[in-house]
Amino acid sequence: MISDNARSGMQQAPARSLFNALGFTAEEMKKPMIGIVSSYNEIVPGHMNIDKIVNAVKLGVAEAGGVPVVFPAIAVCDGIAMGHVGMKYSLVTRDLIADSTECMAIAHQFDGLVMVPNCDKNVPGLLMAAARLNLPTVFVSGGPMLAGHVKGKKRSLSSMFEAVGSYAAGTMTEEDVLEFEEKVCPTCGSCSGMYTANSMNCLTEALGMGLRGNGTIPAVYSERIKLAKHAGMAVMDMVNKGITARDIITKDSIMNALTVDMALGCSTNSMLHLPAIAHEIGFDFDIKFANPISEKTPNLCHLAPAGPTYMEDLNEAGGVYAVMKELADIGLLNTDCLTVSGKTIGECIATAYNRDPEVIRTVDNAYSKTGGLAVLSGNLAPDGSVVKRSAVVPEMLVHEGPARVFDSEEDAIAAIKGGKIVEGDVVVIRYEGPKGGPGMREMLNPTSAIAGMGLGSSVALITDGRFSGASRGASIGHVSPEAAVGGPIALVEEGDIISIDIPGLKLELKVSDEELAARKAKWQPREPKVTTGYLKRYASLVTSGNRGAILKSSADE
């Protein structure tokens, strides 16, 4: 066992004295030691139940003959961090989580790990760590929140943000906003739509790193406690069989996850996280891989914010495996990929079926023949940009309009709420990329303000920042190269005409090459927005959005 390095032989007698201090028995020191990475805290609604999930995992590990040992991982609530300086500290935690988990796992020589994440950066950070460490590893998330109910309709956090925009437009009263505030988030769990957290938990299941139901069983269901116990048992089975994370996280399983992403209509943030996970196994994942996958993958689900259904509905309809069964039946998945259950994807989904074609549409009745995401390129985004095509209204799939240019999120919000943005405009928010932000803030407040003010079907937003999974509309993010490194988005001037062609996968600035070259010759880098602390270090190491905003391993890279 790996843990023998820390516990066996006369040389490790001092370490054993410390295990004795922890209360380990002599019998426990002979059993596999399983690290349980707990993301529990009291500031993230999606993590406030994780202590209960962790306790269930511990029971499962012990039942199967292992010794469970809990250690922590940090987690940020993107909703609470939204709209202020705190959002600069969200994406950056992904790599902190991966790095700190690596340190804990290797320092203490665990034989296996159970990751218990739930929210946005916590899930991909731990997936990166799992791929890097290559230990027997199982994921079990905290689970999604139930939808709220306002005036007889299901609602979620995205409708809360849009309510603020409606209030600014004068179409909603303060009392109406208060009712949303009190009712849209009724339980613990990751916010109830197909936002980033739930997207990544579903893709964890598609990758094979979580058991059936990992992405969809609601946080408050007792079924999730059972799932956690089974996760503890499953990691012991992996230890006994010698199955490790890289047996499961492979190029093929990542492409499976990308295919499921397209069918589910996941958050655009998956186009940051899948490349980062792939990087950990040495797979150079180009975000432009998304387009050929999207071209042949039907979009089967329109969960909030794209439609009126929620994670609890997807769970009742058969969950991720039911979606995967639809895709496998038309040959779009590699069903030979291994899962943490010890079975292949094909074996796992063999008994899955679609219980509600209104929630999971059949291939014959798909929302569209193409997938939920698209990568657009052109002279405004030579290295690509990402849009959630499934959340764009038909009239905005092709659009041309004048640029309204802002060098920060705050300036853009002030203009939108001040009535300075009109139908046809293309809002450009730049210097918000991984390096320029720094931290690549989510532009949920601007997109929600646009939607709430009734401009969602006539105004587009383009940024080198990113979007919450709760954003909808013609919201094009991850524009690469970013403004801070002199990308073309830095050269856009007020009134320039921008052409968006989502079906054609094009994002163009209607300015001549000669004019762009002249502007580039005059361009000067901005002074860093942050000159101290972790963000300074992050800005010096982070790569572009099209590379997953991974960190360089050296200054020369």
From Swiss-Prot:
| Keywords assigned by UniProt, alphabetized | 2Fe-2S, Amino-acid biosynthesis, Branched-chain amino acid biosynthesis, Iron, Iron-sulfur, Lyase, Magnesium, Metal-binding
Single GO BP term? L-valine biosynthetic process
Q: What does the entry comment about cofactor binding?
A: Binds 1 [2Fe-2S] cluster per subunit. This cluster acts as a Lewis acid cofactor.
- Disulphide bonds annotated for this chain are none
A GO CC annotation recorded here is: cytosol
Q: Which GO terms describe its molecular function?
A: 2 iron, 2 sulfur cluster binding; dihydroxy-acid dehydratase activity; magnesium ion binding
Q: Which residues carry this modification: N6-carboxylysine?
A: 121
| Catalytic residues, chain numbering | 468
Question: Which InterPro entries does this entry report, sorted A to Z?
Answer: Dihydro-acid_dehy_C (IPR042096), DihydroxyA_deHydtase (IPR004404), DiOHA_6PGluconate_deHydtase_CS (IPR020558), ILV_EDD_C (IPR056740), ILV_EDD_N (IPR000581), IlvD/EDD_N (IPR037237)
The UniProt annotation places Mg(2+) binding at 78, 120-121, 442
Xref: Pfam families: ILV_EDD_C (PF24877), ILVD_EDD_N (PF00920)
Can you state the subunit structure given in the record?
Homodimer.
Query: Record's family?
Result: Belongs to the IlvD/Edd family.
Q: What does this protein do?
A: Functions in the biosynthesis of branched-chain amino acids. Catalyzes the dehydration of (2R,3R)-2,3-dihydroxy-3-methylpentanoate (2,3-dihydroxy-3-methylvalerate) into 2-oxo-3-methylpentanoate (2-oxo-3-methylvalerate) and of (2R)-2,3-dihydroxy-3-methylbutanoate (2,3-dihydroxyisovalerate) into 2-oxo-3-methylbutanoate (2-oxoisovalerate), the penultimate precursor to L-isoleucine and L-valine, respectively.
Q: What is this protein called?
A: Dihydroxy-acid dehydratase
Recorded source organism is Lachnospira eligens (strain ATCC 27750 / DSM 3376 / VPI C15-48 / C15-B4) (Eubacterium eligens)
Q: Which lineage do the record's taxonomy fields give for this organism?
A: Bacteria, Bacillati, Bacillota, Clostridia, Lachnospirales
Gene, per the UniProt record: ilvD
